[in-house]
Amino acid sequence: TVIFDSGLEKNFLYPVAFQMGMRIVTEEETGKEGFSIVEEDREYKDTVQKLFTFIEESPSQYHAVDTMRKHLEAAGYEQLLESGAWKLKSGGKYYVIRSGSSLIAFRIPAQDSQNYCGFQIVASHSDSPSFKIKTNPEMNVEEHYVKLNVEKYGGMLCAPWFDRPLSVAGRLIVKENNRLVTKLVNVDRDLVMIPNLAIHMNREANKGYDYNIQKDMLPLYGCGEAKGKFMKQIAEAANVEEDAILASDLFLYNRMKGSIWGACEEFISSPKLDDLQCAFSSLEAFLQSEEPLPSENVQANEQSEVDGKNVINEKNVINGKSIPVHCVFDNEEVGSGTKQGAASTFLADTLIRINHAMGRDEAGYRQSIANSFMLSADNAH
């Protein structure tokens, strides 16, 4: 049994418990101070299947954020726009999306909301290692077959991408009624593959190989007559005219489904576990933490020290009084330095606007930040 400080609310513990195949219990169940994570004795297949479904519905980072949006709206969350005014109310549930691929959701305490005590944040990312489709990607090879021109996106293992059914998903910028609109697209069938050479054509294959992405890993799209069909198929999948597409952000994705395996079915395998496993588990935690905790109470806000270092405990994190925040950023795989990445102003902008909407000044914001806790959730690290 692992004991955690009771100041950490359930939305922190759940992602940890989920990935360890365990569950959370409270001090009232164990008689021990703080929350505990204990071995789970019930079937976990339903939860794992929910994870697999989430991943299947999220073939790109844009789809992942859209899937989370649907879950949040089903739970009664209201979308805010960065370009609009925010009028937050006690007990309100909100989310905001940036660039279609990053999302932040939060809840305002139901009582005495102006005096909230800090933020409790779990942050993950929506993108996964993949191959990005280049503009005008069709490459006619010796007039016999067509490959797609791609570039590596993120830190990947190259070998597992070979000999698997792949397809293409992402986002389009489309001209519609003299306006620019975005549309998600997913070619929902096995479309391309990156084939391995037969062993007699590469005798060194089993001795380790330094893959050249532009030579060895261009996906095979079709025979010679496939030339000129790629964007037509993309347009058809998005239900738009091909000449209405002005720009695209498209990625390969693995079509293989997740599986539960092992002697005792103790392992899972799936595409995009980096990092949709954490995006899913933190979203589940965020939504489930709406339920009041049995030991929920209001305590004095004090600062503790252990070995000369400040720590977060039940004295300075007030259950039910802090603001839980669910963050999912894009472009972690390529350094997070974009407008929608973790290194952007997205999180700070959102927290500052929450603080302002609740009628607090800058000093109150600084105090809130000092009383906050953030968990970076990336299961591959």
What does each of the following model-derived ranges do?
Residues 2-381:
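N-terminal hydrophobic/helix-forming segments and targeting peptides
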